[in-house]
Amino acid sequence: MFRRSVFRHSPPRFFYQTLTTEAPVALAASSRRMILFCDHPLEHTDRLRIKTGDAVAAGQRIVPFMDASAYVVAPAAGSIRAVSAFVGDFGRNWTRIDLAVEDRGEADAGFAAAAGQVSMETVRRWMNGLPGGLDTEAISGAEAPIETLVVAATESDLFTVSAQYVLRHRTQNVRRGIDVLREITGAQRVILAVGRDTVQGMGHVHAEIRAVSNVYPASSHGLMLREVLGREIPPGTAPAKAGIAVVPVEAAAALGRSFAEKRVAMEKIVTVLDKTGRQSLFEVPVGTPVADLLASLDIRLDSSDRLIAGGPMTGICLYTDDYPVRPDTHCLLVQDAAAVGRAGSDPCINCGECVRICPARVPVNMLVRFLEAGKYETAAEEYDLFSCVDCGLCTCVCPARIPIFQYIRLAKYELTLSRAAEAENA
């Protein structure tokens, strides 16, 4: 997982974990409630289509607002227990829908009727929130016609093995999903990007197989596309604008399974690590409360423990376990309070460790000075802010314990908002 040369001074190297063939996946105990986040703010309750007590069928599209098309898909049957506003990281506003699960609820027949015809419209109407995180906007070809489809069967962070499990044990679903994606996008070229240690035995999948380095962060989209396509995407440019769609392998598998079974497949593979580092793989519906998943493993959260969704390098810290497993929640990591590394308040000592380890060759020591001062435009124009691949290595090696990665995420988010507002008002 971690190596440093003993013969010369060089940056440490981190390696993705390889899934062992014996790794089992367990079904978590069924939760009696579900939490769903709709990507639309709850500003006016009088515009709601739904209310507390409404019955919900399994697989039903829930469209909360009269004047917005945003929707979620119910992973289980039951009734709406509450509808409330929720503020996520960086102040993003969502609508939270709490469901009370009922064992004898009905299944919705809407997708079963639509699944007879594979089309982009069907995918966009039903597959938002699919496990793995399918970006229906990116694959729609709205930016540019999709010429190349890259199915990423690589891990998003250290300690996670969810993608490898899906590739190895849901291969038939992956194959079906690739066929569906090829049909709806019209892509002429389909590539399956896999870790170098797992490339064997993938020849029967309907795609070109390309191996990706097992040195972190080779799986980040920018670095991965350079390795498998031999071309670079300009900094700050979405792959879709270059005619490239990147789809996580779990999303491809869920897509294939959905059309095969004629139901929206909402089962998510999650890697869970407890305070001792013990690793478990679970299959749970999207929307399962994190608290319920941890309880099924007898993991207790104490004061000042850290709960991370997404992995140790790029994950986000959750302030509560009353939070759902989301489509992109590949990993849940629980850290004991005594093992938590706290951010420091010291200024940069200009040691250069962050510059040496940066895979994108960003002058991080200069960049962080402008980010701390809130000079985001200068950071983007003069110090390659958008060249950053969001790997978190700079924060990991910083002796001053500066939360560099968090500064970078905040800057990118703020600049994206401001530039979108400028374009809208132009």
Question: Which residues does each predicted region cover?
Answer:
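N-terminal, Lys/Arg-enriched amphipathic/low-complexity engagement segments
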Residues: 1-49
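Short, well-structured beta-strand-loop connectors
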Residues: 50-64, 80-82
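Short, conserved beta-turn/loop elements at beta-strand boundaries and strand-helix junctions
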Residues: 82-88, 300
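Acidic low-complexity segments
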Residues: 87-148
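Phosphate-binding glycine-rich loops and their immediate beta-loop-alpha structural context
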Residues: 128-193, 362, 366, 375-379
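Active-site gating/interface segments in enzymes
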Residues: 218-219, 223-229, 260-262, 298-349
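Ferredoxin-type iron-sulfur electron-transfer modules in oxidoreductases and energy-metabolism complexes
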Residues: 330-345, 355, 359-426
